[in-house]
Amino acid sequence: MNHSEIRRKERLAEVREFAEENQIPVQNIQLLNTALTHTSYANEHKNEVIHDNERLEFLGDAVLDLVVGEYLFLRFPSWPEGELTRAKASAVCKPACAECAAKFQVGKYMRLGKGEELSGGRTRISILGDAFEAVIGAIYLDNNYEVAARFILGHLKKFLDLIDQGDYDHDYK
């Protein structure tokens, strides 16, 4: 077994550990591995076939919006569209997603390029928030909508509770 094969097996073991620690059901470990791979890492390893998490982030963002939108729609049947939009924006914003990602240690398991690593990428809000969305995309593809929804609602509970209390009109920008 050569060095790259050993490293690949070690990496997949790390990703399995991440999944187990966070109770993420996994059929296809490679999806979760991709979700935890930043563009900077993929760009530095062009000689290998490594996919970054941007496509999964795109999908995860859509699933996140749908799940939170559905939750708010059903939870607050008398709210007008504008109120639902403001509440959803507070729950799915990058800082909220980054906080969730930090709680389940996404930064520890991210594959980052050398520059991102040196500049504090493991704790950067944009990287963590994007990775949270990518993990959601991986969970959705690897399982189904219901599993992804449970994951999202469980991790966003703090922010959804704030909405229940009427505390959601924050400007995080």
Model region roles, listed by residue range:
Residues 1-173:
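Double-stranded RNA-binding/processing signature
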